[in-house]
Amino acid sequence: MIQETLQSAEEQMDRTIEATREDFVSVRTGRANPGLYSKVMVDYYGSFTPLQQLASFTTTDARTLLITPFDQSALRNIEKALSESEVGANPSNDGKVIRIVMPELTAERRKEYVKLVKSKAEEHKISVRNARRKAKEAMDKAVKDGEVGEDEGARGEKELDALTKRHVELIDEMAKNKEQELLEV
């Protein structure tokens, strides 16, 4: 019973870590990063399709991203979707590929992004703590109902605390790395 609860909590915490990674990839750093466009949807023959399924990405230098559509007829729609995306880049279409030159981030913008990273990190840490709370409640109920002994419940709680601490520290480390990346000029 305790092991299943711990395993379930760990799976939930691991999903939170993955969500944190995805959130941090979508934060712009001034470098060309294909991950910025992972959530861009393109109107392709009447249905919205993720950009990653319609084109390949290449970085030609630190600030230039080259997007090559698999189907040339989708070029205009891809350009339109990129222009309307929240990333804030200006795509240029040369008829075969789309080039995006990432503008240099201002110091003020970098600070805003650092705040955003901190806030996202805090949201994800709360999610980890909520998973811990749910698991602890399940363990306490099992002990109270007599399904497991108090010693086993206490041992499970210690493991749960270690698991929570490890995941929170991982989120902190990811946030610190992203902040350093943002503040690097």
Swiss-Prot record:
Keywords: Cytoplasm, Protein biosynthesis. The keyword Oxidoreductase does not apply. One of its GO terms (molecular function) is ribosomal large subunit binding. The keyword Protein biosynthesis applies. SUPFAM superfamilies: Ribosome recycling factor, RRF (SSF55194). One of its GO terms (biological process) is translational termination. GO terms for cellular component: cytoplasm. Pfam families: RRF. Its main location: cytoplasm. Belongs to the RRF family. This is Ribosome-recycling factor. The lineage of its organism: Bacteria, Bacillati, Actinomycetota, Actinomycetes, Micrococcales. The gene is frr.
